[in-house]
Regions:
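Conserved nucleotide-state-sensing and coupling region of NTP-binding domains
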Residues: 29-31, 85, 112-115
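Hydrophobic/aromatic beta-strand patches that form the interior of the parallel beta-sheet core
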Residues: 30, 79-80, 122-124
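Short, glycine/serine-rich, charged loops/turns that create anion-binding
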Residues: 37, 128-130
Length: 136
């Protein structure tokens, strides 16, 4: 299951980067989970990017600034939500919304007009906790 799902996710990542996913976004985010430290989960996420594309990888994603998040979706290719358990339950609706966005609209600094940019980024995450998402 993991290999098939990961393969499908990687196809979605490539489609997102190539601009082939204009009608829908890559709304799936694989989560690497191990209770033990030192399993190199974060390192695995980082090496998914080819050396030439490492400037388009980020592992600092702050959900408190929604406009900043939207800009990162247009600037980066892979966003690692490292230590996913640090995000609060109240932030999950905003994250879900961000993961489903296909086109981004925001005003850049010192500009009066809004920019419309395609979403490039896909998500991946890591955690040491196994009970990450719970529905009430």
């Amino acid at each position: 299951m993991w290999v098939k799902g990961f393969h499908r996710w990687m196809l979605g990542v490539a489609a997102q980067w190539l601009g082939q996913a204009q009608d829908c976004a890559n709304a799936v985010a694989p989560m690497l989970v191990s209770r033990e430290q030192g399993k190199r989960k974060s390192s695995f996420c980082k090496i998914l990017m080819p050396k030439e594309l490492t400037p388009y990888y980020i592992d600092k994603f702050d959900l408190t600034s929604e406009s900043g998040c939207e800009q990162k979706l247009s600037l980066f290719g892979l966003i690692n939500m490292d230590e996913f358990d640090k995000y609060r339950a109240g932030q999950m609706p905003a994250l879900k919304n961000l993961m489903q966005m296909t086109t981004l609209t925001f005003r850049r600094a010192h500009r009066s007009a809004f920019s419309h940019l395609p979403r490039i980024a896909s998500f991946i995450g890591t955690s040491n906790m196994t009970d990450l998402l719970t529905d009430p």
